[in-house]
Amino acid sequence: MEIKHVFFDLDHTLWDFEKNSRLAFGFIFEKYELNINKLKFDEIYQPINEKYWKLYREERISKEDLRYQRLKESFDLMEFQVSDEIVHLLAHDYIENLANYNHVFENTYVVLDYLKGKYDMHVITNG
């Protein structure tokens, strides 16, 4: 059987989600003038984000709940006071700004250049 197509999952394979996510959060925290420890936030947020993605994949929560609850729980664990209105705004702005950051993993372009012309390449994502 000849391989004709190669499929890539965008996040964590080609696109450096963690780096782009940190940059997007940094931007929106500055936009809303939130004096928050970004390193501590990232440490707390990452496992919470994974937990909510698991619930979403299991169809136990909606995408809107995923986006809101992961932030709300992170802020609560940090004991960082922020209104529900701001959490909703941050959740929305995070998604809007995430695509503005396009850092890829090392050698991504090398691999894609190697495969170009040999295979039909496709990018998929669940985000």
Predicted regions and their residues:
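A short, charged/proline- and glycine-enriched loop
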Residues: 1-3, 117-118
